[in-house]
């Protein structure tokens, strides 16, 4: 076994310091036996530790460096690397790790043919030698968690968008139904105002007429009744005129009869009139006839006759 050399490569020294640091055990640490180290969280390791020690954040470059110094990947389902001279508590063995001169030459510390894969993206899960995805016992990677969160948020947004579309369609249907109801009410009010206004005009000329479904009824009957009233008034007027003429003739006859009964003695004319109940009634009728329009003309006719 080679003795430790003073010129141990800085890559090995820095890697050993990271593995030994207890504050980074959640990201990188020894395995249970101390014969290999495990990178538990490659994403955080590349983001936080590599820039601090190696001035870069490329996890694939770190893996290629391990392959150059003869490290091999022990377990397929996690990033666990081992070298015979890289052990817990035995830092002096680091001098025995030699850098390979070329990919075709082998040495004591050369990596086997199925060595560490170098071009492995950080976001991809570890794969076995057969190329199939391997089940990892390490904590979930940050990128995978972010992708899962984004997928969940997108699904929630799509569901919310669909719900809002359904709600919008329902409100549009309710608005259309409310508009139809409003239009119907407006038409009914307009029709009522039109019919009610016509009924009032007709009522001003005659009697109030009943309405049936917005249409006035009884108009013909009212006109017939008005005609009958006019005929009755004409007949009553004719009857009254005939009665007045008869009364006047009776009065004249009674006056002549009374004049024959008045005796004339010694040049003095004395006129006596016997009034009966019939005469009183006749005089009352004459007074009433005189009070009517045209009554004065009838009185004058009576006086002349």
Swiss-Prot record:
**Position of motif Nuclear localization signal?**
268-271
Q: Which residues form a coiled coil?
A: 147-187
Matching entries from SUPFAM superfamilies are given as: Winged helix' DNA-binding domain
Bias category Basic and acidic residues: which stretches?
263-274
| Compartment(s) where it occurs, according to its Swiss-Prot or TrEMBL record | Cytoplasm; Nucleus
Task: Report biased composition (Low complexity) as residue ranges.
Answer: 110-131
Instruction: Name a GO molecular-function annotation.
Output: sequence-specific DNA binding
The region annotated as signal peptide is: none
Could you tell me the keywords of this UniProt record? Answer: Coiled coil, Cytoplasm, DNA-binding, Nucleus, Phosphoprotein, Stress response, Transcription, Transcription regulation
- Annotated stretches, region: Hydrophobic repeat HR-A/B: 164-193
Residue spans of biased composition, Acidic residues class: 226-253
InterPro entries for the chain:
HSF_DNA-bd, WH-like_DNA-bd_sf, WH_DNA-bd_sf
Among SMART domains, the record links this protein to: HSF
Any one cellular component term from GO for this entry? nucleus
Q: Where is this motif: Nuclear export signal?
A: 275-285
UniProt-annotated stretches for the region Disordered: 97-144, 192-278
- PTM entry text: Exhibits temperature-dependent phosphorylation.
Q: Name one GO biological process term.
A: regulation of transcription by RNA polymerase II
Swiss-Prot/TrEMBL domain comment: The hydrophobic-rich region (HR-A/B) corresponds to the oligomerization domain.
- Please report which protein family the annotation says this sequence is part of: Belongs to the HSF family. Class B subfamily.
- Function text: Transcriptional regulator that specifically binds DNA of heat shock promoter elements (HSE).
Please give the subunit comment from the record.
Homotrimer.
Q: What is this protein called?
A: Heat stress transcription factor B-2a
Source organism: Oryza sativa subsp. japonica (Rice)
């Amino acid at each position: 076994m080679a003795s430790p050399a003073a010129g141990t490569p800085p890559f090995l020294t820095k890697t050993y310091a990271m593995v030994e640091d207890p504050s980074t055990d959640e990201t990188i640490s020894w395995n249970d036996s101390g014969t290999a180290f495990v990178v538990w969280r490659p994403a955080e390791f590349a983001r936080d530790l590599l820039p601090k020690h190696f001035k870069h954040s490329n996890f694939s470059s770190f893996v290629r460096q391990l392959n150059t110094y003869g490290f091999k990947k022990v377990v397929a389902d996690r990033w666990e690397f081992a070298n015979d001279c890289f052990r817990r508590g035995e830092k002096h063995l680091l001098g025995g790790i030699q850098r390979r001169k070329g990919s075709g030459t082998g040495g004591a510390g050369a990596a086997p043919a199925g060595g560490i894969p170098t071009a492995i993206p950080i976001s991809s899960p570890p794969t076995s030698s057969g190329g199939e995805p391997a089940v990892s016992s390490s904590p979930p990677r940050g990128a995978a968690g972010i992708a899962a969160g984004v997928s969940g948020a997108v699904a929630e947004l799509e569901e919310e968008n669909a719900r809002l579309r359904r709600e919008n369609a329902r409100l549009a249907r309710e608005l259309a139904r409310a508009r139809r109801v409003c239009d119907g009410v407006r038409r009914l009010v307009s029709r009522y105002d039109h019919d009610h206004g016509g009924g009032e005009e007709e009522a001003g000329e005659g009697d109030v007429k009943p309405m049936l479904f917005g249409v006035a009824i009884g108009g013909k009957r009212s006109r017939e009744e008005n005609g009958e009233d006019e005929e009755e008034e004409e007949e009553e007027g004719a009857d009254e005129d005939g009665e007045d003429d008869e009364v006047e003739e009776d009065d004249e006859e009674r006056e002549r009869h009374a004049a024959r009964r008045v005796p004339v003695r010694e040049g003095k004319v004395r006129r006596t009139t016997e009034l009966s109940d019939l005469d009183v009634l006749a005089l009352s009728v004459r007074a009433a006839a005189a009070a009517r329009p045209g009554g004065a003309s009838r009185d004058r006719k009576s006086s002349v006759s």
